[in-house]
Amino acid sequence: MRKLLIILLCSPIIVFGQNLAVGDTYEGGIIFYLDGNGGGLIAAPTDQATVNDFPDWGCIGTAISGADGLTLGTGAQNTIDIENGCTTSGTAADICSNLVLDGFSDWFLPSIGELEIMYLNIGTGSNIGNFVNTKYWSSTEKDETYAWSWEFSSGYQDYNSKTSNKYVRAIRAFSNITNINKQQISIEKKIIKIFDVFGRESNNKNQPLFYFYDDGSVEKKIIIE
């Protein structure tokens, strides 16, 4: 079974005399990850594609070589590989790749691991990133038919047809991302149902929920806000 490696690091760091922390506005967006060595990831302050103009992943039927990076630090290369392997304009990756915001033009579509960290650090609680409770595309391809997305309403990954239309939030990196401590979560399985302790279907936060997957496994999670 494939695994997704992630990290949560919220400690302030010093960059060129500045004391930076997750949630700060910096270089065109909102910091959602710091590596402790002067590097980090920034989310654009608003969605690049919304309900009135939201794209598909693109190029269904084609497996994009190299666009399967799962972890922190892989979204940029995923986006490059998608742009090279899928010439369709207006796709999720294409929108991010062509974004120019506050003078920065190095934006990209986040990997599924980067999306999860973005959700956990600036998407829950006070929702600093002002995300919508819906699915956002990642740059992580599953195969020629499906790509991974992150559900911001309940906090889990899913894979969807590349023809599906979803929200998009671009990100960019500052300095070189290093010192990535990792933990494992499952990626190669799909949620079928979510139940509360009384057996009712629920996506409510701040309570124990049971996630039932298509491989027969069950996980108990609590998403705190």
Describe these PLM feature segments.
Residues K3-G17:
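Sec-dependent N-terminal signal peptides
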Residues Q18-G38, R200:
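N-terminal module-boundary/linker segments of secreted carbohydrate-active enzymes
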Residues D24, G28, D35, S89-T91, ...:
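C-terminal, surface-exposed recognition/capping segments
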Residues D35-F108, I112-G113, I117-N121:
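Short aromatic-cysteine micro-motif
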Residues S175-R200:
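Residue-level detector of functionally pivotal "anchor" positions at catalytic/ligand-binding pockets or at interdomain
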Residues T178-N179, N206, V218-K221:
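Short, compositionally biased serine/threonine- and acidic-rich segments at solvent-exposed termini, linkers
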Residues F210-E225:
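C-terminal tail/sorting-segment detector
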